[in-house]
């Protein structure tokens, strides 16, 4: 069993809290400034970015509350990868350096999530790093966009690889790196603008960190930071101690490539065993399917798999509705160990591609939650509906336009609450993009955006409802899709029913024929007037549907979420022609 790290020096709790507030404010300011300065909607609207301060040992001190955990969480891994590469080169950190990094085999979550790292010096001593990460619209992969690259055959087909590249060396801009970048990506104005916003936000973080140290002293800030990490570690250990010692196993499945003739590329197993030993917890992924060598649904162990596990454990064992706000730092992960055999989906071997790893990581989180449901049933939800991520693109005046959209998933029901409808799920929390923003910037028309009709999974607490979005092309273009959950429905829990699968289709302008498409769709041409429809999965139900309050069943009917027939058959609730509950008939039905 590992032990809690000792403090650098004794420090009073009031000072610790003051330093905590100061650090958290820095991360918030970084995130706010990054969102305000960015060009692309995936950052300024969807907030698919991360900001954090990291100490000299690579431990995360704070993270931006405005960012997605899948961006902020991997930042220590970015630092670890950068240091390893620089040590191999015999390179050093210097004042004025800005380092660009996106290698998924060196800590990055995947190639499009480009990080910018600024080493922070105080009195000529390296004391830490200020880091921003963000998802970029294009990094020069084989087809337009940075999602839906589902046919990448290896890491090289996924786009440019930046392995600890100094874009500023001791304050001097390396113009040649920027020239190479601009010449090898689509939509360079947007991408480079976003990158410059990241650098500016990271510089703000570095400056504010130094200001905190100048105000309170380096020893005080370091001691307070260690105390905060010890506190977070203790919170996690105390939560783990409440679990019975033992092993808890669950399995889940990914669609994979349902249109493939190769059985090794579809129906892919995710196997999770949780091992509890006192205040230590191990997540063992042995039994997970082998890596898919020439398809990019493999997951980097460091940057995706670890973050899916850490964030799921944090949200389940330290639910913020119970514990309130507490320090988000590297102390939380000290009690947790991850085992993932090499050569599997969860620990691929280079150069296996990884760019389309999002839904795979979400499946790891979902299966981990399923395993924990055996011991903390009141702290988990039923199965979640995965996301559909779409890249739209086209050409105008010899230039590319590229737009990325995140089609929401849905949560399963949980003890005491219905599942959340049409939201990002589990290890991410990005926001949707306003329709007005889409239609004012791109030749696209959103014809329909609403919740699915009559498809909520029955349960004492029903599953969340997925959304439907129909988008028409106003000019010739193309699109690609990275999705899952078109075959395997989200699981129901404790007599709750399974959710509903998603779907993808296109109605071509010329033939007017509706064509069903697979969940992994490589770049496909779309003529002007063609319309695509994305239907998001619905989360699983929790608990026996016959125990659902009749008033909630009526409310769902009035909202259009279920039909009278479903209310009767699934919930045993009779709704009259005057849209009221017939309690006598309902009670009789439920007795049967």
From Swiss-Prot:
Domain of life, per lineage: Bacteria
Presence of the UniProt keyword Hydrolase in the record: yes
GO molecular function, one term: 5-oxoprolinase (ATP-hydrolyzing) activity
An individual GO BP term: amino acid biosynthetic process
Enzyme Commission code(s) on record: 3.5.2.-
Keyword tRNA processing: no
Enzyme class: hydrolase
One Pfam family, short name: Hydantoinase_B
One term under GO cellular component: cytosol
Keyword annotations from UniProtKB, A to Z: Amino-acid biosynthesis, Hydrolase, Plasmid
InterPro entries in the record: Hydantoinase_B (IPR003692), Oxoprolinase-like (IPR045079)
Entry's family note: Belongs to the HyuB family.
Quaternary state and interactors: May form a complex with HyuA.
Protein function: Involved in the asymmetric conversion of racemic 5-substituted hydantoins to the corresponding L-amino acids. HyuA and HyuB are both required for the conversion of D- and L-5-substituted hydantoins to corresponding N-carbamoyl-D- and N-carbamoyl-L-amino acids, respectively.
Name this protein carries in UniProt: Putative D-/L-hydantoinase subunit B
Organism this protein belongs to: Pseudomonas sp. (strain NS671)
